[in-house]
Amino acid sequence: MLQNVTPHNKLPGEGNAGLLGLGPEAAAPGKRIRKPSLLYEGFESPTMASVPALQLTPANPPPPEVSNPKKPGRVTNQLQYLHKVVMKALWKHQFAWPFRQPVDAVKLGLPDYHKIIKQPMDMGTIKRRLENNYYWAASECMQDFNTMFTNCYIYNKPTDDIVLMAQTLEKIFLQKVASMPQEEQELVVTIPKNSHKKGAKLAALQGSVTSAHQVPAVSSVSHTALYTPPPEIPTTVLNIPHPSVISSPLLKSLHSAGPPLLAVTAAPPAQPLAKKKGVKRKADTTTPTPTAILAPGSPASPPGSLEPKAARLPPMRRESGRPIKPPRKDLPDSQQQHQSSKKGKLSEQLKHCNGILKELLSKKHAAYAWPFYKPVDASALGLHDYHDIIKHPMDLSTVKRKMENRDYRDAQEFAADVRLMFSNCYKYNPPDHDVVAMARKLQDVFEFRYAKMPDEPLEPGPLPVSTAMPPGLAKSSSESSSEESSSESSSEEEEEEDEEDEEEEESESSDSEEERAHRLAELQEQLRAVHEQLAALSQGPISKPKRKREKKEKKKKRKAEKHRGRAGADEDDKGPRAPRPPQPKKSKKASGSGGGSAALGPSGFGPSGGSGTKLPKKATKTAPPALPTGYDSEEEEESRPMSYDEKRQLSLDINKLPGEKLGRVVHIIQAREPSLRDSNPEEIEIDFETLKPSTLRELERYVLSCLRKKPRKPYTIKKPVGKTKEELALEKKRELEKRLQDVSGQLNSTKKPPKKANEKTESSSAQQVAVSRLSASSSSSDSSSSSSSSSSSDTSDSDSG
């Protein structure tokens, strides 16, 4: 029994031993114990085996770092320009979407991408590096841009769309970099008070998000604080439209929730996690899809409202937190803003030049003017031989600075600098280069506007000669005219009267407005400079003045002979013409300030302030004196402006023309001056300061052609007695008009002197008639003699007669 039991129990004993020995055998490896675990593992193996099978494909390497506490960074004007201007322009371009995030070789099925491209780079990484102050110098950032474009050209075929897109972006990049500040300067950074709180919120938001596709997160949007945040938001960037401007309520809600987290692209927000689809490089670029980031823990706000905030917030926050904005001065768009200078006003020609400069810097011409906005940065553009070839660089910003600093004395210096800029471009670049074509286009704009330069810089602000000319200058001009007269004493009296009138007018203007006096002083200095230039230019042909002097002397001799021959005939006419002299009083009322006093300046300015030489209806009856001495028929260029003496002489000569000739004068003025075409030809007032130089020259030629024929008549045909009497009476009328004007102008609103002058005229008319022809000839020989000089010469001649 026991034997049976024992052998029988051995079998179970073995099994029991095995079961009882489970503990000891578990410590040692045994097949039985591991089989269940192997079966269990085998049961799960189909699911687990799929994971390493998917991981056999090459994984994307970690993206480039966007912040490094060990690597020093800083904020410079060039880096800020690259961030605010260059990156902003590239980011919103329609071809920028493939470059906004690192290349996902797994999703795009590019297994060899990271074998060929050893240093990946994208605009999102560059942008985040700029936001995190990762770069020490702008050259590092520019190198990243170049790496990104070079990677695209290396990996893709030249005919691929992505290559054309990269070329377009690179061209825009180079255009913007050309306008970058030339010298790199570090900027002072101010740290906002609440930056730590925002950083804590950002860390909390970032820590609550997990992702299978880890990318570095963006630090706080405050431009100054650097953070190394924990894991980030998994997002996929899609095409987005250009974000609109953020309203203030949205900004407030965003600030209360903390800064939004951005993808590797930093500005364009991405879809929620539910929509994770890769974007291939050659996707449709015409239908952008606006998406937004829904950050866990942030308040519930519409995705559409978060999207523009995420895209626009960093630059807006930086601008609001940074009162100093040096790069704004370097932007091409801000170059049009005219900064008022405190260094005095520009002349008329330089104002025109300043307008040309503004147009060259305007957005209208920016497409082909941008290479000339800033000095050529030879080191940044790799033009190592530029300064060897171009000895005098020039650009529009330098021209603008010189204009604001009043470094240009005249328009010629301004034009020389602009043309130097274009010639430098033509000299350095080959003729078929794009920048040469742009330079030619911009130069066409410049030359077209420069050709419209005002002929006379002082014409737009006409001034009465008595106030505009300083006494010394007026005196010198009067002396030059007195040298041409036949009577020295009469010319001295004329100068004294001129100076008295000028002093009266100057005192009135200075008492009325001090600013106007200051302006007049400036214009007087400019006028002196112009006269000096004209004198220097006109001294080229020296032979002509000598001829004029010889002709003057000959004509003086002829006049003297005429005086002797006519003396007897004048006395015969004394009786019949005695009752006629009182008429000038009526004639003066009809003609106003017309007739023009020889002592009152080139355009017949009266002391009372009336400017202009009137050609009234009654003045058409006046007969002219003979040709004035000292003014010969010298041909002048139409464009050359008239001097003070020439205008004065022309005013006197027009008053000498007979009635039948004045119609032609009016016709010339109306034909050449559009503003006077509708005026009444019966009575037209001429202001020589407003007439074009070409009009004045045409009038001068016509007047000279009329007066040149007069001296020849006495030699060929003797005038009958009747004609001589008519000429005598009209000449006397003209002299009395001059005298009345002088007296009324000096006393200015007093009526007694004109009456005295009339009484004196009536009392001495009998004596003056006898010698009127002699006075007429003397007045014709002295074109600039005044009324007082005429009357004095008349009385002296009557005494001698």
UniProtKB/Swiss-Prot annotation:
Q: Which residues form the Bromo domain?
A: 74-180, 344-453
| Compartment annotation | Nucleus; Chromosome
Positions contributing to a protein binding = D112, Y155, N156, K157, D160, D161
Q: Where is this motif: Nuclear localization signal?
A: 555-559
Q: What is the effect of changing R558G?
A: In a gastric adenocarcinoma sample; somatic mutation
Modulation of this protein's activity: Inhibited by JQ1, a thieno-triazolo-1,4-diazepine derivative, which specifically inhibits members of the BET family (BRD2, BRD3 and BRD4). The first bromo domain is inhibited by GSK778 (iBET-BD1), which specifically inhibits the first bromo domain of members of the BET family (BRD2, BRD3 and BRD4). The second bromo domain is inhibited by ABBV-744, which specifically inhibits the second bromo domain of members of the BET family (BRD2, BRD3 and BRD4).
Report the main location listed first in the record.
nucleus
Write out the biased-composition intervals (Basic and acidic residues).
Answer: 316-332
State one Pfam family annotation. BET
Gly residues bias spans: 592-612
Instruction: Using the record's annotations, give every residue carrying the modification N-acetylmethionine.
Output: M1
Which parts of the sequence belong to the NET domain? 632-714
Checking InterPro entries in the record gives: Bromo_Brdt_I (IPR043508), Bromo_Brdt_II (IPR043509), Bromo_chromatin_reader (IPR050935), Bromodomain (IPR001487), Bromodomain-like_sf (IPR036427), Bromodomain_CS (IPR018359), NET_dom (IPR027353), NET_sf (IPR038336)
Q: Which GO terms describe its biological process?
A: chromatin looping; chromatin remodeling; neural tube closure; nucleosome assembly; positive regulation of T-helper 17 cell lineage commitment; protein localization to chromatin; regulation of transcription by RNA polymerase II; spermatogenesis
What biological function has been recorded for the protein in this entry? Chromatin reader protein that specifically recognizes and binds histone H4 acetylated at 'Lys-5' and 'Lys-12' (H4K5ac and H4K12ac, respectively), thereby controlling gene expression and remodeling chromatin structures. Recruits transcription factors and coactivators to target gene sites, and activates RNA polymerase II machinery for transcriptional elongation.
What does the subunit comment say?
Homodimer. Interacts with E2F1. Interacts with (acetylated) STAT3; promoting STAT3 recruitment to chromatin. Interacts with CTCF; promoting BRD2 recruitment to chromatin. (Microbial infection) Interacts with herpes virus 8 protein LANA1.
- What's the protein here called? Bromodomain-containing protein 2
Q: What is the lineage of its organism?
A: Eukaryota, Metazoa, Chordata, Craniata, Vertebrata
